[in-house]
Amino acid sequence: ILETAMTLPLLLLVTIGIFEFGRAFQTWQVLTNAAREGARVAVLPNYVAGTAEARAKQYLVSGQLPNAGSATVTLDPTVNVSIGGATASTSVVTVNYPFQFMVLQPVARLVVKGATVGGPITLTASAQMRNESQ
């Protein structure tokens, strides 16, 4: 009984950690897909300003992220890339999202005293695609 009492909390913490990092990975996948959707819109020949950001934010909402409105989406439409002497113009869409662990951060606040422990972390995903107007 003593062994169970000592190992069960550790085993539960490891199990919860696996679920938490799985949730973080799933959130990062939604961010990556949102950046790709925004980049697909941004590289079109008749691009209208603001539509790439709107499309990425729409994907975040459809991905059912909590507080999807707190994500920031930025577009850099004129990134020049040189490969083997050839230059191509690309667009880069970057999505930043404040991710809050549900269990691990409150546990960390109990164990380690400090102002920065337990706050949200920023997950970042970006996508770069060649502009089709060339």
Name each model feature, range by range.
Residues I1, V14, A86-A88, P120-T122:
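Short, solvent-exposed coil/turn segments
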Residues F101-Q134:
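Low-complexity, S/T/G/P-rich flexible repeat/linker segments used as non-globular hinges
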